UniProtKB/Swiss-Prot annotation:
Similarity section: Belongs to the PheA/TfdB FAD monooxygenase family.
Metabolic or biological pathway, per its Swiss-Prot or TrEMBL entry: Aromatic compound metabolism; 3-phenylpropanoate degradation
Positions of FAD binding: 8-37, 273-283
GO BP, one annotated term: 3-(3-hydroxy)phenylpropionate catabolic process
Name used for this protein in its record: 3-(3-hydroxy-phenyl)propionate/3-hydroxycinnamic acid hydroxylase
Key word Oxidoreductase present: yes
Cofactor list: FAD
E.C. number: 1.14.13.127
Originating species: Mycolicibacterium gilvum (strain PYR-GCK)
NCBIfam families, alphabetized: PRK06183.1-2, PRK06183.1-3, PRK06183.1-5
Keywords annotated in UniProt: Aromatic hydrocarbons catabolism, FAD, Flavoprotein, NAD, Oxidoreductase
Function according to Swiss-Prot or TrEMBL: Catalyzes the insertion of one atom of molecular oxygen into position 2 of the phenyl ring of 3-(3-hydroxyphenyl)propionate (3-HPP) and hydroxycinnamic acid (3HCI).
Reactions it catalyzes: 3-(3-hydroxyphenyl)propanoate + NADH + O2 + H(+) = 3-(2,3-dihydroxyphenyl)propanoate + NAD(+) + H2O; (2E)-3-(3-hydroxyphenyl)prop-2-enoate + NADH + O2 + H(+) = (2E)-3-(2,3-dihydroxyphenyl)prop-2-enoate + NAD(+) + H2O
Superkingdom to which the source organism belongs: Bacteria
Length: 569
């Protein structure tokens, strides 16, 4: 595609959000051009924490087994007061989405795996050394121009994943509302970890708050608050850096320093994530403090949410109105993450000793209450997507605790051919219709069943293990899975709904009892602006076929994954 100047999607920025989005679109046969003003990928870590949702997305694009070697799963985060008394601990035990909730990771190595994944596709190209300076929308295209007289490109859509100083956002003319903290931090990355333990800690010491994070591969990050009377130049001095390190390690002069720099925290969100054919994702759309490690992960969520929608529109499986749901769904959740990260930062880093002492007393008192202690330990405070509007259907007959708009769980299951598979590996990468132990074709009716089949949806019947090999409902179009851990039975135990319409990003788009499935299916097609079949605009497919993915090679997860369950973009 070297000479290609006419593509479906231009992605501006080869960071994690842009690379993940390119992989999602590449799998769907969408013609993608990724451009970046740099000459190569950034080779130093910015984000240091991966969550379960990001790993689930990497699983969906077939790259999780390449990413896992660069992670520290199930990483514990401990908060200490000035006397090193434990204030709180975060060690979430469950892996309801298939992966650990907290993982340290080496961002440059993970980003390199995302970049390497694009080599599987002959419909995706990356061009470094291309700085976009103009993009002009017409009725059905966007004309993209670059500095230095480089050839312009015509695309149907442009997605700006070009960071906090986004050129795309500026060209869209949208605001970047929020605040920038006056507090500065010194970040120091060190090879050959001088501490060597696998976990991370925050020192909530009012004299000088600090952070110590185990990344992976023997890399550790230290962060120290810089006092107002200390200049950036002073903080950049190697002697100052060694003095800071000397608070935590015995021989700071012996460390193998990778880099150090001064930074500030931003809490900002774009006024709009979409203007016509231009969209924003990752840091271009939102910036947040580092305290919850959600900057990187929020960019991956953007890519997962936007990717399937763009692919559906470009390949003719949905109307353009579906793209309106991107801002509707992602804005509220990104805002919640920004607010949480900002609040945690305020709790961690007061420099007034009386305020810090009061905080410590409150936290110690709260820790004596088991339910509050579990709330923190299991990270139940983390905002989870629950879409009330967007690409979902909340119908009049839904139960009060309807799962619609939430992420479906991902336990391990058995099929008749494999054991201990992650659920998403059975559901595939597109839509899925899932039911509990029922005849799915009869439940949906032939018309609805045929419409979902034309969109490439997978049909999955969940059964108790005792019924896995019973042939009574066998249908060549329906996969039968056994609930090997009981997690799916437990999930259905607390929900009235037994039929689920699951989106490609694993959000439940609609849920209902079996008898209402045909009408809910029809309503969902309208709500998501889906077509009756895949009327492809490229790729050589015909109605009822999946698009030609133009895949050179797609690595498939093994039946037994190497995973054991858990920024910047």
């Amino acid at each position: 595609m070297t000479e290609q100047t006419d593509v479906d999607v231009v992605i501006v920025g080869a960071g994690p959000a842009g690379l993940t989005l390119a992989n999602i679109l590449g799998l769907e046969g969408v013609r993608v051009l990724v451009v970046d003003e740099r000459d190569k990928l950034i080779d130093y870590p910015r984000g240091v924490g991966l969550d379960d949702e990001s790993l689930r997305t990497f699983q969906a694009i077939g790259l999780v087994d390449r990413v896992l070697p660069h992670t520290v799963p199930n990483q514990i985060l401990r908060f200490f007061d000035a006397k090193r008394n434990l204030l709180a601990e975060m060690a979430p035990p469950d892996a309801r989405f298939g992966w650990p909730k907290r993982n340290g990771f080496v961002q440059p190595m993970v980003d390199a795996e995302l970049f390497g994944g694009l080599q599987r596709f002959d419909n995706v190209e990356v061009r470094f050394g291309h700085r976009m300076h103009q993009c002009t929308q017409t009725t059905d295209r966007v004309e993209v121009e670059f500095d230095g007289g480089q050839a312009s490109v015509s695309a149907r859509y442009v997605v700006g994943c070009d960071g906090g100083r986004s050129v795309t956002r500026r060209l869209m003319g949208v605001s970047f509302d929020g605040t920038t903290s006056s507090t500065r931090w010194l970040v120091v990355d060190i090879a050959n970890d001088p501490l060597g333990h696998p976990n991370s800690e925050v020192g909530a010491d009012p004299r000088r708050p600090y952070v110590s994070i185990a990344i992976a591969h023997g890399i550790r990050r230290f962060e120290f608050m810089i006092h107002p009377d200390e200049t950036d130049e002073e903080a950049d001095d190697p002697a100052f850096v060694r003095r800071m390190l000397g608070q935590l390690i015995p021989y700071p002069e012996r460390v193998d320093m990778i880099r150090h720099r001064v930074y500030t925290h931003h809490s900002r969100i774009a006024g709009s994530f979409r203007e016509g054919r231009l969209m924003l994702a990752g840091d271009a759309a939102h910036l947040m403090p580092v305290w919850q490690g959600q900057g990187y992960n929020s960019g991956i969520r953007d890519a997962a949410n936007l990717g399937w929608k763009l692919a559906a529109v470009v390949t003719g499986r949905a109307g353009e109105e579906l793209l309106d749901t991107y801002d509707v769904e992602r804005r509220k959740h990104a805002r919640a993450m920004i607010d949480l990260s900002t609040m945690v930062g305020r709790v961690i880093s007061p420099t007034n000793r009386k305020v810090a002492a009061l905080r410590d007393r409150v936290i110690h008192a709260a820790s004596a209450v088991p339910s509050l202690k579990r709330y923190v330990l299991e990270m139940r405070f983390k905002p989870m997507p629950r879409y009330q509007q967007g690409a979902v259907l909340h119908h009049a007959h839904a139960a009060p605790n309807s799962p619609t708009g939430t992420l479906f769980i991902q336990p391990r299951v058995d099929t008749r051919d494999t054991q201990n598979a992650l659920l998403d590996d059975v559901l595939g990468t597109g839509f899925a219709v899932v039911c509990w132990s029922n005849n799915l074709r009869a439940v949906l009716g032939e018309e609805a069943f045929g419409r979902w089949k034309a969109l490439g949806a997978k049909f999955v019947e969940v059964r108790p293990m005792s019924q896995l090999r019973w042939p009574g409902h066998d249908d060549p179009d329906v996969a039968v899975i056994g609930d090997r851990t009981g997690a799916l039975k437990a999930w259905f135990d607390v929900h009235t709904e037994s039929v689920l319409f699951v989106r490609p990003d694993r959000c439940i788009a609609a849920a209902c009892i079996a008898q209402r499935a045909p009408e809910i299916s029809e309503g969902l097609f309208a709500a998501l602006h889906l077509t009756s079949g895949a009327h492809l605009t490229q790729g050589g497919g015909t109605d009822g076929e999946k698009p030609d993915r133009a895949v050179l090679h797609v690595a498939q997860p093994a039946a037994e994954s190497s995973g054991t369950g858990a920024g910047t973009s």
